[in-house]
Design a protein with these regions (language model features):
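Short aromatic/hydrophobic "clamp" motif used to bind/position activated sugar donors
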Residues: 122
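A glycosyltransferase accessory/donor-loop signature
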Residues: 1-20, 26, 186, 191-323
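Active-site-proximal specificity loops/subdomain of glycosyltransferases
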Residues: 72-114
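Hydrophobic, well-ordered beta-alpha structural blocks that scaffold small-molecule cofactor pockets
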Residues: 306-420
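Conserved donor-nucleotide/metal-binding helix-loop-beta segment in metal-dependent transferases, i.e.
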Residues: 129-162
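Short internal beta-strands
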Residues: 52-59, 150-152, 357-362
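Short, polar loop motifs at secondary-structure junctions
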Residues: 59-60, 85-86, 134, 360-366
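Short, acidic, metal-binding catalytic loop of nucleotide-sugar glycosyltransferases
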Residues: 40-49
Length: 420
């Protein structure tokens, strides 16, 4: 294993040109979950092929590195690369804004063509995936003179629905993309390195990173960089599993053609991508939950993943008990956040409570729609609703302060309760 950490250098292959080259990017906290992706990749690999696997990370610890290296068979190479120095030395005023669920590592995939120019093709995979087939087949797909191969994002088929007008507007006006239905997911990207114009690519990175209203930062940037330069393939190669696509309403809303494509990819997907905050390690209701744990049991991180699962279930039960007990009180209540937690809670307990005035959500595409029998309102409607109590159902530790400030600014006098 050649340790590339903290060296601002171009990465060179360790095998010949026929090797399968794969990059993952994550922080140390995600190492245990990545081990499941790695195990699934190993179990479905070809013993006659070589696999050059490189981890992009800025904070991975020695303990995690040692545990991951224990998993590696003879035909695999596992190396670790910190791109921080390269980025700082190459770019000035580069805006790499992080969000609640996403660390700076989410951006590192963007720099693959720049630091891996000695490769012909490189596959990037997110770490919250399970490889469910031999990945060699993906490398055999021709680029057809395109710079990357990717899969259409799960939400793209429903973008034409009236409720998603704001999402379409973001893709067209903010990102400047001509065809929103070609918007791809960044969790699986096969780069055609030899075809990418590095100078032009570098300029576009600088320009696109300055957009201040990116919803999915790395993914939005990559869609700008590779507009009209991407070959879209079957979503079997990046099947997005989450509460949305498991919901029967999703299937009833999308068109017949898109529904057929979706159901076909759902049947024995080649790569399973757990794309929402609801993951197999924090919820038993996630689609392909059993597949994830089949591989997790084989990793040296199994006990740690199991502990995370147990703690998540305890935390979830505590939130449910707290929310349930608050709803029993004779007070006018508004729920803040049309979150997956709230949807699951209302369904699970079949909640029908006249004290619930409605749900507040900042996403304007949800305004006017219903969860169960409860209408979703915008924050501007809160004063008119005039609740005694506002319960935050979005599981974010820093969310209470912003809501409290909103209440002060709008002279709203209600008790604010957080479930975190």
């Amino acid at each position: 294993m050649l340790d590339l950490l903290n060296k601002p250098m171009e990465i060179a292959p360790v095998f010949d040109k026929k090797s399968i080259n794969i990059v993952f990017s994550f922080n140390d906290e995600y190492s245990k979950f990545f081990s499941v992706a790695l195990q699934s990749l190993i179990d479905n690999s070809n013993n006659e092929k070589n696999y050059d696997v490189i981890i992009f990370s800025s904070d991975i610890k020695e303990r995690s590195i040692k545990m991951l290296l224990q998993m590696i068979p003879p035909n695999f190479s596992l190396r670790f690369y910190n791109p921080t120095n390269y980025i700082e030395n190459t770019f000035q005023n580069l805006n790499l804004e992080t969000k609640q669920y996403w660390s700076v590592e989410m951006y590192y995939r963007i720099f693959i063509p720049l630091v891996m120019q000695k490769y012909e093709r490189v596959l990037y995979l997110d770490s919250d995936i399970v490889v469910n087939s031999n990945i060699d087949e993906l490398f055999s797909i021709t680029f057809d003179n395109k710079e990357i191969i990717a899969v259409c994002d799960t939400t793209s088929p429903e973008l034409y629905l009236p409720k998603n007008s704001s999402r379409r507007e973001h893709i067209k006006k903010v990102l400047g993309l001509e065809d929103e239905t070609k918007y791809f997911n960044s969790g699986m990207l096969l780069f055609n390195i030899t075809l990418i114009d590095i100078q032009e690519y570098t300029k576009k990175i600088l320009k696109s990173s300055q957009i201040s209203t990116l919803l999915y930062p790395d993914q939005d940037i990559l869609n700008i960089l590779f507009e009209k330069r991407v070959k879209l393939i079957s979503s079997k190669w990046n099947y997005g599993s989450n509460v949305l696509v498991c919901n029967k309403n999703y299937l009833s809303e999308i068109s017949g053609t898109e529904r057929k494509k979706f159901l076909k990819s759902r049947n024995n997907p080649k790569i399973i991508h757990f794309i929402s905050p609801i993951k197999p390690w924090n919820s038993t209701g996630e689609e392909f939950y059993e597949t994830f744990w089949f591989y997790a049991r084989k990793t040296p991180f199994y006990e740690e993943i199991l502990y995370t699962m147990n703690q998540s279930q305890i935390d979830k039960a505590t939130r449910e008990i707290t929310l349930f007990s608050r709803l029993l009180r004779d007070r006018k209540i508004v729920l803040w956040g049309a979150s997956e937690f709230l949807v699951n809670f209302l369904e699970k307990y079949d909640i029908c409570n006249k004290n619930i005035l409605g749900i507040i959500d900042k996403n304007t595409s949800k305004t006017g729609t219903l969860i169960r029998n409860y209408r979703i309102y915008s924050p501007n409607d809160l004063k008119e609703l005039n609740p005694d109590e506002i319960i935050i159902t979005v599981i974010k530790s820093n969310f209470k302060k912003s809501i409290y400030n909103f209440m002060i600014e709008n002279n709203i006098n209600a008790e604010l309760i957080s479930l975190v």
